[in-house]
């Protein structure tokens, strides 16, 4: 690259950054919205699928479990691929994969066909969270990073709401297959991203540094990215801490999201219609909370707000369980929803700023998705307590997980260790 070319490239980066990252944000927001819709479709279509294929409860549950396994694999591979091939390319590839295979689910003729295709599609769906957040963290200025990434995460929550509305309209009128046929529509977002958004400058510079090292007289041996992470004492320590924190966060979140509606309905005796209204209200306040948390985290720091959201959730959940009445449960749920929505708004920024560009995708994807294994056991844990007592007892275990999740980074992980807009 000549000096003149370098100057022109630098000018392009400084003149158009806002236009580029705004375009990237809109497309990534819609991609995560589609991701949230697709993931939620399984829950809403499960009863219809179970009836059509004459499935047992165990077989029906296996669809969700294998989807989760696929998501973990996708997150691990996707994080590595982001560092190896580029953030934009990975999002494009996995979006096409997920949309194509999810659409194919509308044509399956057996349970095993559905299980296999859904598991592979989940690999694509699982990678998009890491890839989109990594891309945006490297485009958005530090001053606004948490606010923008928090707004990005509202797309996923909004996707769950959209899935509720779409399933309620489509399944009674057209059947569950139509639900999956329409998942081909978001594939257009992949092509728009490919043509409108270039790879982040920090990733391009990081790759160029590696090429220069390879071209030098010193022979550079390619290493497994996980080996690179574990070899460095500081990277290894932060990586292991985030695995523990992410595991506790997803353990608590999975347990609450799966069992909270059942708790309201069975333990508190709330009607299904009223329970649905409470959950919609909770989702809406979560969206608001994510935006507020992002703004406050940019102003006061990621560490403090993440601890407040996670530990606040942990401390407020017993209040919901032990001090609810028919007249105050709505207000308690809204206050709980605000705290419950905060951690995921800050988590992505906090994690991406904990690692350098050269290993960011691998480290964040690895920590988050190894931690996701904890989510597999959360519904079973609450089910165990519910079998011998009440769902509320199991929810208290989730509160403990949230407290641990916030305590670990509060004690050991500093704010803004690395700037995602720099090569390293």
Regions picked out by a protein language model, each given a short descriptive name:
Residues 73-109:
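Conserved MFS/SLC helix-loop-helix module at the cytosolic interface between two early adjacent transmembrane helices
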Residues 117-154:
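Cytoplasmic helix-loop-helix junction between adjacent transmembrane helices
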Residues 152, 156-195:
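Helix-loop-helix hairpin linking two adjacent transmembrane segments in secondary transporters
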